[in-house]
Every structure is written in C-alpha cells, then in structure tokens.
Regions:
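Internal anion-binding site segments
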Residues: 1-113
Length: 113
C-alpha cells in the first residue's frame, strides 16, 4: 500500500493515486482510508465559488472545506485537492455526499500520512 504524503505537490499526489489504484491510503481518525478518486483544484476556483475555507497556507493534509454533494477539500504542498471517492476501513466504497455522511469531517481536521 502507498501512504499519501500530503506534503507533496497536488499533481504528484494525483498521479500516484491513479498509478497505484486502489492501494493509496491515508489515516483519518485513526482508521485507514483508501483514496480512490481525487481532483486537483486551483485555489482561485475555490475563491471564485465563495466557499468558506481555511488558508491554503495550512499544513498539508488539513481539511480546508467540506462541500455538500461535492466532496472534501484537502490541502497539499501546492494546490488543494477534492476527495471524490474513498473507502473507510470497515465500510463500503463511497463518494461525494455519501462519503461526507460516512466520515462526518470538519474543517481543520487532519489526514495523516
């Protein structure tokens, strides 16, 4: 398995997740979270959509925003990414709204590598 290093550039994280599908993972609240699908975002896109989020200067791996019906935005070394599909330990694969309901994430929480 490949532990996602949120301190890498967003594009490198995206490439590794695609290349190692479905073995990329992280930890959320001490549980294994397999990362199945993400999208790299531009911080300008997020600002233009008027979402409330923390500064992109945040520590990599911090949840910047939780957007209902869209996904969970996470900081990286460069641009943020949006988590679109994942599998929490002991649960089924879920995406977007279902994933948010399953994880119940909060802005400021941390995904560890």
């Amino acid at each position: 398995d490949f532990k996602v290093d949120w301190g890498n550039e967003a594009i490198k994280i995206s490439q590794k997740i695609k290349a190692l599908y479905p073995r990329a993972n992280t930890t959320f609240r001490s549980k294994n979270l397999k990362i199945l699908k993400i999208k790299v975002l531009s911080i300008d896109v997020i600002k233009n959509e008027n979402y409330l989020f923390m500064s992109n200067n945040s520590r990599p791996g911090i949840i910047l925003a939780v957007i209902e019906n869209e996904g969970i935005i996470i900081s990286t070394k460069t641009d943020p990414i949006i988590l679109l599909e994942a599998k929490l330990e002991g649960k089924n694969i879920s995406s977007k709204k279902q994933l948010i309901q399953q994880l119940k994430p909060s802005v400021g929480e941390y995904l560890s590598d």
